[in-house]
């Protein structure tokens, strides 16, 4: 599902490779996205984030819209979704696969193996901050940008000879959204601000101290009632003029300058516990942010962000098109070969990971941290048959290793919930993750069999744990995650079977993610011994064997896996001269499927077989 990717992220490592951190030069190129008109749709807005909060800034002069996210606002509540019928029917599906009845096998898997309770919960928008500026519908000299050097969004324009500026940050250090409003003449800042939300039954109140609150709860989805309670709080600090708060609208009139603050919090503690107090958390974030002036808050925010950004620099030459808007540079790229745009793209990829994955928080999901819908495409979940992994490919090679912490915690948590699923669905020890999970760390097979009958998500995620060790040599880290690696390897050791044609050890049933094969006349994905499965398990077992030697533990298990590796299907070259995607030579040279899953080991590991 390559369309579901973290915006602008996918080619960072493929295009650039391993970049060594270096000292900043005295003359450092400026990295920014800039435009000469406001955003018309959500995908044109500029993304800000601090790992926990996301903001999409439209930059419209008359009525600013800043769409807001908080990383733990998801539909539903704690649950797992393993289907107990799977234990009986997976062997029957396997028999059909081995008999060459692939479509029948896939149909049976959809009916009897896939989750019946739910297919995972959607990540949901909080809502919007809307700021109306009377008289600002006619303007000139418009400019907006996203500074990748400082994680700030700037909007500038002129109305009736007055120059206005908005500066927005999602503060890493204060954990609130701040919008700074200034003009080049005194007394010109007048606005009405409010919080809105697409959620049903939200409650909006005006409180003492010129504060607006918006409270709500996440959505019901697939029969699972939403239980994530959230609250947003809106206030402002003005110099000069008047401030008032009535009927959920915060108004400032005739100020010299003003700063708008938004805090958001939920009751989410972890995937099993939602007993937190969202009101007290939102109050605390806001009150602590109001202690310091905006200039100090911005300084702290920028310094925090740049500690990540400046670990790596990429200079591909002079910026020859700095006076051309970013959208035009992208449009012209095929003719201009704009090297500085490539460098900007590289830093934009790093920027997005910094802004959507901070230690202590949730990992970057299908849309990072940015989503304007209650029910987004593919639920904006954690799709584990390439998308979640792909978000983090740049982390080690671009010197953002510590931003893996949310991913590593997710892996630990799905290894816990996945033990239950392994027992219920497969009668196996160890742990399993299929092709998707969410904030509740569901691990059952979901959606329909063409995508969902794939038990190798855990094996792929384990590669990220091993990768951390390979980059750092940190044996204590390896010791802490070794049980996760081992238990995943144990699961595959128990569920893999010998297929009847070659007597090879294979995963069955499974699929080469989402791609149909000619063994079913292009009607089914379900198969046995898919090359990607073979590669992932080879990689996992090899890592476990190496880790056992490094840690001087589990020698018998390592020796057992070494023997099992010899029984696995090898990589095979088909009659087109291609690396086969499946155990049989089913590849079609006209296949234009967006996945090339059987090449995964070439990218993520060392294809030594």
Predicted segments with their positions:
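C-terminal, helix-dominated tail/subdomain
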Residues: 508-540
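Bacterial Sec-dependent N-terminal signal peptides
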Residues: 1-24
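Aromatic-residue-lined binding/catalytic grooves and analogous aromatic/hydrophobic interfacial grooves
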Residues: 22-450, 456, 465-469, 475, ...
């Amino acid at each position: 599902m390559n369309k579901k990717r973290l915006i602008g992220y996918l080619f960072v490592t493929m295009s650039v490779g391993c970049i060594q951190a270096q000292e900043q030069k005295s003359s450092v190129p400026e990295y920014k996205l800039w435009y000469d008109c406001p955003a018309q749709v959500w995908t044109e807005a500029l993304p800000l984030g601090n790992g926990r909060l996301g903001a999409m800034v439209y930059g419209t002069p008359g009525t600013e819209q800043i769409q807001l996210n908080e990383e733990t606002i998801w539909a539903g509540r704690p649950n797992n979704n393993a289907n107990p019928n799977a234990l009986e029917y997976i062997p029957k599906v396997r028999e059909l696969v081995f008999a060459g009845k692939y479509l029948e096998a896939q149909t049976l898997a959809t009916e009897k193996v896939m989750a019946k309770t739910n297919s995972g919960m959607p990540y949901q928008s909080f809502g919007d901050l809307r700021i109306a500026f009377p008289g600002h519908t006619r303007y000139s000299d418009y400019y907006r940008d996203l500074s990748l050097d400082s994680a700030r969004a700037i909007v500038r324009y002129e109305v009736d000879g007055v120059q206005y500026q908005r500066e927005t940050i999602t503060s890493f250090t204060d954990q609130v959204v701040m919008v700074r409003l200034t003009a080049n003449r005194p007394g010109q800042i007048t606005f009405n601000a409010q919080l809105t939300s697409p959620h049903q039954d939200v409650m909006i109140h005006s409180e003492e101290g010129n504060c607006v609150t918006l409270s709500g709860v996440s959505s019901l989805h697939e029969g699972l009632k939403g239980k994530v309670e959230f609250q947003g709080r809106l206030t402002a600090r003005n110099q000069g003029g008047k401030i008032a708060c009535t009927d959920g609208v915060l108004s400032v009139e005739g100020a010299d300058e003003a700063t708008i603050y938004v805090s958001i919090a939920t009751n989410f503690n972890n995937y099993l516990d939602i007993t937190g107090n969202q009101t007290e958390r939102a109050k605390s974030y806001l009150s602590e942010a109001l202690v310091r002036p905006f200039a100090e808050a911005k300084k702290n925010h920028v310094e925090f962000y740049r500690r990540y950004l400046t670990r790596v620099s990429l200079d591909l030459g002079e910026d020859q098109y700095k006076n051309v808007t970013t959208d035009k540079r992208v449009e012209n790229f095929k003719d201009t070969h704009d090297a500085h745009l490539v460098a900007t793209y590289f830093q934009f990829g790093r920027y997005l990971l910094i802004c959507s994955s901070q230690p202590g928080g949730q990992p970057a999901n299908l849309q990072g941290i940015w989503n304007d819908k209650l029910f987004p495409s593919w639920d904006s979940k954690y799709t584990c048959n390439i998308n979640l992994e792909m978000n983090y490919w740049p982390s080690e090679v671009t010197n953002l290793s510590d931003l893996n912490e949310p991913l590593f915690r997710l892996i630990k948590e799905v290894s816990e919930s996945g033990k239950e699923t392994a027992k219920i669905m497969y009668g196996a020890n160890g742990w399993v993750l299929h092709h998707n999970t969410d904030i509740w760390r569901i691990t059952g097979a979901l959606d329909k069999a063409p995508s969902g009958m794939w038990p190798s998500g855990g094996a792929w995620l384990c590669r990220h744990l091993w990768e951390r060790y390979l980059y750092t040599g940190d044996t204590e880290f390896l010791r802490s995650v070794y049980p996760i690696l081992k238990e995943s390897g144990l699961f595959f050791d128990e569920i893999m079977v010998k297929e009847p044609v070659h007597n090879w050890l294979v995963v069955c049933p499974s699929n080469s993610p989402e791609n149909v094969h000619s063994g079913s006349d292009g009607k089914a994905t379900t198969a046995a011994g898919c090359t990607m499965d073979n590669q992932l398990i080879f990689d996992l077992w090899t890592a476990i064997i190496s880790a056992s030697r490094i840690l001087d533990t589990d020698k018998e298990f390592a020796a057992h896996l070494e023997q099992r590796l010899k029984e696995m299907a090898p990589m095979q070259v088909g009659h087109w001269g291609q690396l086969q995607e499946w155990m049989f030579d089913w590849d079609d040279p006209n296949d234009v499927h967006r996945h090339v899953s059987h090449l995964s080991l070439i990218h993520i590991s060392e294809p030594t077989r």
